[in-house]
């Protein structure tokens, strides 16, 4: 049984993420799909119940899935979601994020920070769905890897749990300005380890010698018709580094396709 938790504040961005997730698992019968909401008080609970029931009925009727509603009063959203993910032994959390346009700066920061905090919790992979993303069949997935300590840092099982939902073609990409005509022995060894881990997907490898990770990833996504991007954040100071450096933050905020963050 695959459990997916979709936290929602009942905003358009969160509803879009829920619809994306429901479409993604349409027709998969062993999925436990949990809509989760935190309300502030009894008055808020009454209106939230109506909206949650409405969203549940929409998702079930359109996508032929069984949806479970879980609601709680107050508390920290991220801590609550983490608790629910551990309780349900979730394999995936799906959250929406606001892009650079269309929303206020305050809303961008708030929604972005909640999503990134959830990634930092490292309870299970988090699928970040852009506010404008529409679901299309997931045929091509790109895994970005730094090819360092693959044996210990690559979260093979959590990534496979998600990939097995749709069995896509897997493209494994490394961006490094020091790549020349041939790979170093170190890169060849790490390539072999990645191939062994993901051999059932028959991955294709790409070593791109450029400086700009974000621009290169965006170009690759467009050229190869990539439907989902996978990143593997490092444990050390992930949340802080996202806001102090530009690469991962830009990658998430500017992406037009979902990004799966699976912690090492």
Q: What are the residue ranges of the model-derived segments?
A:
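Hydrophobic alpha-helical segments and helix pairs
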Residues: 83-132
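Short, flexible loop segments at boundaries between secondary-structure elements
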Residues: 254-264
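Glycine-rich, Arg-bearing micro-motifs that act as flexible, cationic patches
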Residues: 96-117, 232-254
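Charged helix-capping and loop-helix junction motifs
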Residues: 51, 110-114, 156-157, 186-190, ...
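Charged docking surfaces used in two-component/phosphorelay signaling
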Residues: 71-79, 211-214
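Small/aliphatic-rich secondary-structure junction motif
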Residues: 1-46, 140-206, 226-228, 254
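Short, well-structured alpha-helical segments in soluble
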Residues: 80-88, 216-224
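Short secondary-structure boundary segments
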Residues: 37, 97, 174, 233-234, ...
């Amino acid at each position: 049984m695959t459990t997916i938790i979709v936290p929602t504040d009942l905003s358009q961005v969160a509803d879009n993420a829920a619809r994306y997730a429901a479409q993604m698992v349409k027709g998969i019968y062993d999925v436990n799909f949990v809509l989760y909401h935190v309300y502030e008080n009894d008055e808020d609970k009454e209106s939230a119940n109506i909206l949650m029931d409405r969203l549940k009925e929409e998702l079930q009727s359109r996508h032929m899935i069984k949806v479970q509603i879980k609601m709680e009063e107050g508390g920290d959203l991220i801590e609550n979601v983490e608790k629910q993910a551990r309780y349900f032994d979730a394999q995936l959390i799906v959250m929406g994020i606001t892009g650079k346009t269309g929303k206020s700066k305050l809303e961008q920061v708030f929604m972005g920070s909640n999503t990134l905090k959830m990634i930092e919790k490292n309870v299970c992979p988090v699928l970040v769905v852009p506010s404008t993303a529409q679901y299309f069949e997931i045929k091509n997935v790109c895994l970005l890897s730094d090819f360092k300590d693959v044996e210990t840092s690559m979260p093979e099982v959590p990534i496979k749990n998600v990939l097995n939902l749709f069995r896509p073609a897997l493209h494994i990409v490394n961006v490094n300005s020091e790549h020349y005509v041939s790979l170093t022995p170190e890169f060849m060894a790490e390539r072999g380890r990645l191939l062994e881990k993901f051999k059932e997907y028959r991955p294709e490898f790409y070593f791109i010698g450029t400086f700009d990770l974000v621009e290169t990833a965006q170009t690759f996504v467009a050229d190869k018709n990539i439907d989902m991007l996978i990143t593997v954040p490092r444990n050390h100071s992930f949340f802080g580094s996202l806001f102090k450096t530009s690469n991962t933050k830009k990658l998430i905020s500017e992406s037009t396709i979902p990004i799966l963050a699976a912690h090492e």
